[in-house]
């Protein structure tokens, strides 16, 4: 079997030195890089910006990201801008991300939207390996990009797989395929006349139905203020999943920020930091 040639790859390990979380074993090459950590508002939790220096994902691109959190480490990861998937007439784009979270560690991954343009084909496979007492908050936003005919769903497909393991046991397998050629995405059971999809996972030992009810109460007013749909469900473990349907990226971002803020205030007793990207 031929060795995989990566368009970009990145490895990052975060550890706790007793006072704050620091990075080591940083490696990146080609189209992916990670900027030096920022400690926003003098927080002990570093924020890392992951950058695609090419500006977008092109036909045949392959990406690999591996993040390790050692015991008691905490980190916030984000992108510097939207992930743009351009047309892929001959092949497709693949991205593989693995997150290994050790005891009592916590990772926030708050990404910018994935924008699939006309005739784009995108596959992403995320693997999360947690311990019983580690935690994570992860988000995805999927949006259609510009098309020559002005229609919303002109990409070929967006296929996202998320696998979550706790102590090596598979607890969540989320296999999402959005393929306009095979299904009417604006129909019932899919996007239902909406164009933008937001998702989030939160895994933590303190998550139970009461916590989920409180999260839903914190975001319920958005459905009165905006044209959107919000669903929150308990996972088959101590965690929850959020799904949002709407027609604007900004609405999804506002809702996910509210969820993240509630989590940080309730469990970690701190405010979330504004991720400056301008």
UniProtKB/Swiss-Prot annotation:
GO terms for molecular function: nickel cation binding. Its main location: cytoplasm. It is found in: Cytoplasm. It comes from the Bacteria. Coiled coil: none annotated. Signal peptide: none annotated. GO terms for cellular component: cytoplasm. InterPro entries: UreD. Transmembrane segments: none annotated. Keywords: Chaperone, Cytoplasm, Nickel insertion. Required for maturation of urease via the functional incorporation of the urease nickel metallocenter. UreD, UreF and UreG form a complex that acts as a GTP-hydrolysis-dependent molecular chaperone, activating the urease apoprotein by helping to assemble the nickel containing metallocenter of UreC. The UreE protein probably delivers the nickel. Belongs to the UreD family. PANTHER family: UREASE ACCESSORY PROTEIN D (PTHR33643:SF1). This is Urease accessory protein UreD. It comes from Staphylococcus epidermidis (strain ATCC 12228 / FDA PCI 1200).
């Amino acid at each position: 079997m031929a060795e995989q040639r990566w368009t970009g790859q990145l490895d990052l390990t975060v550890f706790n030195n007793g006072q704050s979380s620091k990075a080591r074993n940083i490696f990146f090459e080609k189209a992916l890089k990670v900027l030096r950590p920022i400690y926003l508002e003098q927080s002990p939790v570093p924020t890392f910006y992951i950058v695609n220096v090419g500006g977008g994902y092109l036909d045949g691109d392959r990406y690999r990201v591996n993040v390790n959190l050692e015991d008691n480490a905490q980190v916030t990861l984000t992108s510097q801008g939207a992930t743009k998937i351009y047309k892929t007439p001959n092949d497709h784009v693949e991205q593989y991300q693995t997150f290994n979270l050790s005891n009592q560690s916590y990772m926030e991954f708050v990404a910018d939207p994935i924008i699939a343009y006309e005739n784009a084909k995108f596959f992403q496979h995320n693997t999360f390996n947690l311990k019983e007492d580690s935690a994570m908050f992860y988000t995805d936003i999927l949006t259609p990009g510009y098309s020559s005919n002005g229609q919303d769903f002109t990409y070929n497909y967006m296929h996202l797989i998320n696998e979550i393991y706790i102590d090596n046991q598979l607890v969540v397998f989320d296999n999402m395929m959005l393929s306009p050629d095979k299904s009417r995405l604006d129909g019932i059971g899919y996007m239902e006349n909406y164009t933008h999809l937001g998702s989030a996972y939160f895994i933590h030992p303190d998550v139970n139905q009461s916590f989920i009810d409180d999260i839903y109460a914190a975001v319920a007013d958005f459905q009165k203020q905006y044209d959107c749909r919000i669903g929150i469900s308990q996972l088959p473990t101590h965690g929850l999943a959020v799904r949002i349907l709407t027609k604007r990226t900004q609405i999804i971002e506002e809702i996910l920020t509210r969820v993240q803020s509630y989590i940080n205030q309730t469990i970690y007793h701190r405010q979330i930091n504004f991720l400056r990207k301008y």
